[in-house]
Amino acid sequence: VVIDARKEEVLILAPTEAIETADSLEVAFSDSAVLPGAVKQTDSRMGLTMIRVDATSLDDAQFEKIKPVKLGNSYGVRQGDLVISMGSPAGMVHSSSYGFISYIAKNVQMTDGNARVLYADIKSKADAGTFLFNTEGELVGWATDRYEQDVDTGMKTFMSISDYKGALELLSNGIQVPYLGIEGQEVTSEMEKNGMPSGIY
């Protein structure tokens, strides 16, 4: 998805897994223009990469067709909401799908904090790049397979974009997202019986 569009630099967010083995990058736009791209910054923890494209070779008419996505408020997403997945949800570029939010997991533990995970009955292919939109056309999440259940329920998982807006700004400016690598775990009663005092470890 296009995050920002200026002639000197168009910024595109993509899953790292989709491009990490590529020797070079080429970005195709809707009017069939193809331009070379380069990695601006990568977030290894979340598996996302910001790609930059120099669009100064495009004329004004071509450039005006490049529209950055509007970031939505994923905290406002509710169970039962209609959502649309775009990108490569069917494993093919420019495919799309629609479905409903089935469940929202709040405060899911992850490295250095918590995040929301959205579950939807919708087609999605995380490694090829699938992004989740609300009915206003706003980006509310991106596909991940890290939190999918072992049993195939048909539910696909998406990370909340609102939890990631600060990191997205860093990537857009070519700044590495800092992480301490802390993963919290609640001390269970069984662990307490074995002599581990309550606290954060």
What would you call each of these model-derived segments?
Residues 10-14, 37, 51, 80, ...:
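Terminal peptide-recognition signature
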Residues 31-33, 42-46, 112-114, 173-176, ...:
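Short flexible coil/turn linkers enriched for glycine and charged/polar residues
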Residues 37, 139-198:
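C-terminal cap/linker of serine protease catalytic domains
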